[in-house]
Amino acid sequence: MNKTYISTLDQNDPLKTHREKFELPKGVIYLDGNSLGPLPKSVPGRITEVVNEQWGQSLISSWNDHDWITLPARVGSKIGRMIGAEENSVVCADSTSVNLYKLLSASVRLIPERKVILSDTGNFPNDLYVIQGLIQQLGDGYELRLVKPEEISEVLTEDIAVAVITEVDYRTGRRHDMTDITAKAKEHGIKVIWDLCHSAGAFPVDLSGSGAELAVGCSYKYLNGGPGAPAFLYVTPELQNDIQPPLSGWMGHTAPFDFDLDYRPAEGISRNLCGTPGVIAMSALDTALDVWQDVDLHQVRQKSQKLFNLFAELIENLGPETDLTLQTTFPEEQRGSQISFAHPQGYAIMQALIDRGVVGDFRAPDILRFGLTPLYLSYADIYRAVEIIADIIQTKSWDQLKYHERGLVT
């Protein structure tokens, strides 16, 4: 495998022109889009317009004149088309944590006689914290049951009310079989909430086709919505009017500007809204999503797998002396869009990589994690990144005090 071969891959890449849509610092190979996507070039202009023209000149009339009030539904629809959702089944709102709390709280109320919430030890800890917090509020015998990721489909029993599952493991990149787990859960009357934080924008998701009923996700990773961008939630049309919102805010009221003293939930997905939307952040996301208008997600998936295979092969060719252990060891259909390696000095190596312009991230206790984001990554990027990884490990340039000092964010 040589640079000529790599160059040919890039020349034949059907997605290569999309790289131009992003602000990518010179000399940086950005392999952390699974944590924070880069800035789409179209976003600053939209933010300037919203701030200077809409807020600055139109003031409060912008809620009508510039359709601020419909942003949660409009942005939700754009996301919905990317995750295989039915029309009017997704809204953009709040954070993933808040949306998980909303759907989880509403779901356990649908099956009050069941007291178990199921999740797995590979789930993102934040989701487990939300579950634990809700259980403290519920009391009355509720429990969180944790199992190994590979055991989920085998432990679905009729005392379980809800299962909370992140489709792609944030550390290893393992991808659960949404269709299989959802079908088996339904056989036992279990509601499943799918966390799509590492799925949306990474590969084609088919919520409707898989039979999924409930989902949440963020927009600042593969969707490139920006730091702290608003999240989204999905409820299948069949369940929408059964959901009783635990956070009954005015944006979820059937007529918010009637100012009724009593809460009456809106019909459909809108009842899951709560407070006033963050217009500036949601407008940025709205524009960021336009990057995907002419993108075939199946091509994204195909390139992602090729990037993975190239990365894995190049690391393997370095030999065992690197002490890097591949953690994403699953078949293609069971992988997300990242590649992870374990190394005893993973944190220091990652800091040295970042210092050399190869930006990935570290996840405790020893995981070097690299996001594979086909819209702006080239095959040459992967080739060069592995060259730098090899140099850092072979020269032990990672073994400097500055690379061992832990930052607040890893």
Name each model-derived stretch.
Residues 1-410:
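Pyridoxal 5′-phosphate
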